[in-house]
Amino acid sequence: MFDGFAPKEFRNDPKKRTEWAKNQLILAAKASKNLGIKVHVTFSGALVWPYLYPWPQRPDGLVHTAFKELSRRWLPILNEFDSNDVDLCYEIHPGEDLHDGLTFEKFLKYTNNHSRVKMLYDPSHFILQQLDYLSHIDIYHEYLSLIHI
């Protein structure tokens, strides 16, 4: 489903595509530092999103396994951003594993509260999910580093 985002030589090979994407983010961390940019935006990925709806029932531990894998993939990237003194803002977005405050908190927990984990806030995504976009600011203001308005 995500092949269209990668160059042709990485399509139809999820392992190679994932490695390419990881390398692109590592380059982005370095480029951000070179440009004097202190915050960078990204999406989290969607390992568990397709299983969000509770029917049919998902296997026990699926969400735990997905967030464990998500953090395994992101920790080296977060560490690279940290070594370049750049925060990484995850856009809270339907279709992504980080799609609300609770999933952001879960990711934060699985990354051991990594200091570079921040949030891009776009209230339109909250409206689509019928979430209270104003209280989100009160609760997560310390993590909001970028905003789409």
Segments from the language model and where they lie:
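Short, structured active-site "lid" loops
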Residues: 1
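Active-site acidic/histidine proton-transfer and metal-coordination neighborhood
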Residues: 5-119
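Short, conserved clusters of charged catalytic residues that mark active-site
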Residues: 23, 72, 128-135
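Short hydrophobic/charged patches on amphipathic alpha-helices used for structural packing
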Residues: 29, 134-137
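Active-site glycine- and acidic-residue-rich loops that bind
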Residues: 95-101, 124-133
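Core-facing hydrophobic residues within beta-strands of well-ordered domains
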Residues: 114, 143-144
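Short, conserved loop/helix-junction motifs that constitute active-site signature segments
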Residues: 138-142
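Conserved small/polar residues in nucleotide/adenosyl-binding loops
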Residues: 148-149
